[in-house]
Curated annotation (Swiss-Prot):
Gene: gpt
Positions with a binding annotation for Mg(2+): 103
Protein name as catalogued: Xanthine-guanine phosphoribosyltransferase
Binding sites annotated in the UniProt record for 5-phospho-alpha-D-ribose 1-diphosphate: 47-48, 79, 102-110
Entry GO CC: plasma membrane
Taxonomic source organism: Cereibacter sphaeroides (strain ATCC 17025 / ATH 2.4.3)
Subcellular location(s) of the protein: Cell inner membrane
UniProt family annotation: Belongs to the purine/pyrimidine phosphoribosyltransferase family. XGPT subfamily.
Entry EC no(s): 2.4.2.-, 2.4.2.22
Pathway noted in the entry: Purine metabolism; GMP biosynthesis via salvage pathway; GMP from guanine: step 1/1; Purine metabolism; XMP biosynthesis via salvage pathway; XMP from xanthine: step 1/1
Chief localization: membrane
Single GO biological process annotation from the record: XMP salvage
Length: 167
Protein backbone atom coordinates (compact mmCIF):
# COMPACT_ATOMS: atom_id res chain seq x y z
CA UNK A 1 0.00 0.00 0.00
CA UNK A 2 1.34 3.40 -1.00
CA UNK A 3 2.19 5.73 1.91
CA UNK A 4 0.15 8.94 1.93
CA UNK A 5 1.69 12.37 1.92
CA UNK A 6 0.66 14.58 4.87
CA UNK A 7 -1.79 16.62 2.79
CA UNK A 8 -3.57 13.50 1.45
CA UNK A 9 -5.24 12.79 4.78
CA UNK A 10 -5.73 16.34 5.91
CA UNK A 11 -8.09 18.01 8.33
CA UNK A 12 -8.52 21.66 7.36
CA UNK A 13 -9.47 23.89 10.28
CA UNK A 14 -10.98 27.29 9.51
CA UNK A 15 -10.74 30.37 11.72
CA UNK A 16 -14.39 29.84 12.62
CA UNK A 17 -13.79 26.19 13.54
CA UNK A 18 -10.77 26.89 15.77
CA UNK A 19 -12.78 29.63 17.49
CA UNK A 20 -15.76 27.31 18.12
CA UNK A 21 -13.54 24.45 19.28
CA UNK A 22 -11.51 26.74 21.57
CA UNK A 23 -14.73 28.06 23.11
CA UNK A 24 -15.85 24.47 23.65
CA UNK A 25 -12.53 23.83 25.41
CA UNK A 26 -13.16 26.85 27.66
CA UNK A 27 -16.64 25.60 28.52
CA UNK A 28 -15.21 22.19 29.41
CA UNK A 29 -12.60 23.84 31.68
CA UNK A 30 -14.99 26.29 33.33
CA UNK A 31 -15.17 25.71 37.08
CA UNK A 32 -12.55 22.93 36.98
CA UNK A 33 -9.60 24.90 38.43
CA UNK A 34 -8.13 23.89 41.81
CA UNK A 35 -8.96 27.20 43.55
CA UNK A 36 -12.74 26.93 44.00
CA UNK A 37 -12.98 26.16 40.29
CA UNK A 38 -10.76 29.08 39.23
CA UNK A 39 -7.50 29.07 37.30
CA UNK A 40 -4.64 31.42 38.28
CA UNK A 41 -3.34 31.91 34.73
CA UNK A 42 -3.38 30.65 31.16
CA UNK A 43 -0.09 29.78 29.47
CA UNK A 44 -0.15 29.27 25.71
CA UNK A 45 2.43 27.04 24.07
CA UNK A 46 3.76 29.04 21.13
CA UNK A 47 3.06 29.30 18.40
CA UNK A 48 0.03 27.11 17.80
CA UNK A 49 -1.38 27.49 21.30
CA UNK A 50 -1.59 31.29 21.19
CA UNK A 51 -4.99 31.57 19.50
CA UNK A 52 -6.69 28.88 21.63
CA UNK A 53 -5.09 30.30 24.81
CA UNK A 54 -6.39 33.79 24.01
CA UNK A 55 -9.90 32.49 23.38
CA UNK A 56 -9.88 30.35 26.55
CA UNK A 57 -8.60 33.25 28.65
CA UNK A 58 -11.30 35.54 27.24
CA UNK A 59 -14.12 33.05 27.76
CA UNK A 60 -13.04 32.26 31.33
CA UNK A 61 -12.12 35.89 32.13
CA UNK A 62 -8.57 34.96 33.09
CA UNK A 63 -6.47 38.12 32.85
CA UNK A 64 -3.06 36.62 33.62
CA UNK A 65 -1.69 35.18 30.38
CA UNK A 66 1.86 34.10 29.55
CA UNK A 67 3.61 31.92 26.99
CA UNK A 68 6.12 29.13 26.79
CA UNK A 69 7.93 28.63 23.51
CA UNK A 70 8.95 25.08 22.71
CA UNK A 71 10.64 24.20 19.46
CA UNK A 72 10.04 20.62 18.38
CA UNK A 73 9.94 20.96 14.59
CA UNK A 74 12.43 22.22 12.05
CA UNK A 75 10.19 22.84 9.06
CA UNK A 76 8.27 19.51 8.92
CA UNK A 77 10.93 17.38 10.64
CA UNK A 78 10.39 16.54 14.28
CA UNK A 79 13.39 17.03 16.57
CA UNK A 80 13.93 16.78 20.34
CA UNK A 81 11.91 19.59 21.98
CA UNK A 82 13.65 22.47 23.68
CA UNK A 83 12.34 25.49 25.60
CA UNK A 84 13.18 28.76 23.85
CA UNK A 85 11.18 31.06 26.17
CA UNK A 86 9.80 30.14 29.59
CA UNK A 87 6.95 31.87 31.45
CA UNK A 88 7.62 33.90 34.61
CA UNK A 89 9.05 31.56 37.26
CA UNK A 90 7.24 33.28 40.16
CA UNK A 91 3.92 32.85 38.33
CA UNK A 92 4.45 29.21 37.45
CA UNK A 93 5.89 27.51 40.52
CA UNK A 94 5.15 23.81 40.02
CA UNK A 95 2.14 24.66 37.84
CA UNK A 96 -0.59 24.52 40.51
CA UNK A 97 -3.63 26.43 39.22
CA UNK A 98 -2.06 27.04 35.81
CA UNK A 99 -3.87 26.11 32.62
CA UNK A 100 -1.44 25.28 29.81
CA UNK A 101 -3.06 25.42 26.37
CA UNK A 102 -1.92 24.22 22.95
CA UNK A 103 -3.65 23.71 19.63
CA UNK A 104 -2.69 20.05 19.25
CA UNK A 105 -0.99 17.19 21.02
CA UNK A 106 0.61 14.96 18.39
CA UNK A 107 3.43 12.72 19.65
CA UNK A 108 3.19 14.21 23.14
CA UNK A 109 6.90 15.13 23.29
CA UNK A 110 6.28 18.87 23.68
CA UNK A 111 3.76 18.39 26.48
CA UNK A 112 5.98 15.77 28.12
CA UNK A 113 8.79 18.34 28.34
CA UNK A 114 6.50 21.08 29.67
CA UNK A 115 4.90 18.66 32.15
CA UNK A 116 8.32 17.87 33.64
CA UNK A 117 8.73 21.60 34.31
CA UNK A 118 5.20 22.16 35.68
CA UNK A 119 3.92 18.80 36.95
CA UNK A 120 0.84 20.23 38.72
CA UNK A 121 -0.40 22.28 35.76
CA UNK A 122 -3.52 21.30 33.82
CA UNK A 123 -2.82 20.60 30.15
CA UNK A 124 -5.54 21.31 27.60
CA UNK A 125 -5.49 21.06 23.81
CA UNK A 126 -8.12 21.62 21.18
CA UNK A 127 -7.11 18.55 19.15
CA UNK A 128 -5.44 15.31 20.26
CA UNK A 129 -3.84 12.42 18.43
CA UNK A 130 -3.70 8.97 20.09
CA UNK A 131 0.09 8.96 20.72
CA UNK A 132 -0.04 12.21 22.66
CA UNK A 133 -3.38 11.80 24.40
CA UNK A 134 -1.85 10.48 27.67
CA UNK A 135 -0.01 13.82 28.05
CA UNK A 136 -3.17 15.97 27.96
CA UNK A 137 -5.78 16.35 30.70
CA UNK A 138 -8.56 17.91 28.61
CA UNK A 139 -9.14 18.05 24.85
CA UNK A 140 -12.06 18.57 22.48
CA UNK A 141 -11.54 16.52 19.30
CA UNK A 142 -9.48 13.41 18.65
CA UNK A 143 -7.98 12.92 15.19
CA UNK A 144 -6.16 9.88 13.85
CA UNK A 145 -2.38 9.75 14.15
CA UNK A 146 -1.90 9.80 10.37
CA UNK A 147 -4.01 12.93 9.82
CA UNK A 148 -2.23 16.20 9.11
CA UNK A 149 -4.06 19.19 10.59
CA UNK A 150 -3.96 22.37 8.53
CA UNK A 151 -4.48 25.33 10.85
CA UNK A 152 -5.67 28.67 9.44
CA UNK A 153 -2.49 30.48 10.54
CA UNK A 154 -0.47 28.09 8.36
CA UNK A 155 -2.62 28.64 5.27
CA UNK A 156 -3.08 31.55 2.90
CA UNK A 157 -6.00 32.39 0.66
CA UNK A 158 -4.90 33.06 -2.87
CA UNK A 159 -6.35 33.56 -6.31
CA UNK A 160 -6.58 30.44 -8.48
CA UNK A 161 -6.67 30.73 -12.27
CA UNK A 162 -9.98 29.46 -13.74
CA UNK A 163 -9.75 26.07 -15.40
CA UNK A 164 -10.72 27.42 -18.83
CA UNK A 165 -8.37 30.37 -18.86
CA UNK A 166 -8.33 33.95 -17.75
CA UNK A 167 -11.23 36.13 -16.59
Amino acid sequence: MKERLPHEKGFHVSWDQIHRDSRALAWRLDGQGPDNGAWRAVVGITRGGLVPAMIVSRELDIRTVDTISVKSYNWQEQQPPSVIKAPQAELMGDGHGILIVDDLVDSGKTLELVRTLYPRAHFATVYAKPSGRPMVDTYITEVSQDTWIFFPWDMALQYVEPYRGRD
